């Protein structure tokens, strides 16, 4: 207890980035507390001043800042059981399979985190509303590297857990 969920995720991401090398972490948030804690952790922070536009607005802010990168990994801050090892393994899977995208997979269902190579940035920029990149993954299944997840708990998204009332 004690450490906010978003900080746990950020620390796992920082650990993964230091293991992988050549990574920049960009936090996109509407929340002042998250912005200041992330800045204290030494990562780049961008404010989403239009969160009402949905997930796509945060994604686009991050993409615009990372447009020179070869690829972007998108992660949500409310998957407390996701491990550093899974993040690192996903990047390795993406690199070794030479596909344009990579994502986690559990029981044939894709999940976060996801990685998109630069060739998909334009398609990602065109998404609107409360949608992420899943539609692009579904549009190009032949160009996706899937990392099979052993422990279902890793992909539990706390928002969904509490919004649905499911376990």
Regions found by a protein language model. Name each.
Residues 112-116, 156-158:
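Short glycine- and hydrophobic/aromatic-rich loop-to-beta-strand nucleating segment
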């Amino acid at each position: 207890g004690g450490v906010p969920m978003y900080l746990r995720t950020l620390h796992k991401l920082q650990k993964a980035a230091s293991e992988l090398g050549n990574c920049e972490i960009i936090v996109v948030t509407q929340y002042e507390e998250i912005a200041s804690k992330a800045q204290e952790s030494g990562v780049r922070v961008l404010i989403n001043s239009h969160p009402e536009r949905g997930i796509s607005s945060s994604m686009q802010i991050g993409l615009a800042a990372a447009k020179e990168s070869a690829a972007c990994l998108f992660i949500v801050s409310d998957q407390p059981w996701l491990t550093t090892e899974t993040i690192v393994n996903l990047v390795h899977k993406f690199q070794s399979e030479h596909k344009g995208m990579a994502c986690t997979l559990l029981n044939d269902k894709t999940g976060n985190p996801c990685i998109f190579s630069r060739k998909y940035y334009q398609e990602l920029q065109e998404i609107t509303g409360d949608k992420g990149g899943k539609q692009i993954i579904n549009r190009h299944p032949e160009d996706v590297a899937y990392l099979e997840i052993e422990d279902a708990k890793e992909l539990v998204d706390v928002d969904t857990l509490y919004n649905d009332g499911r376990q």
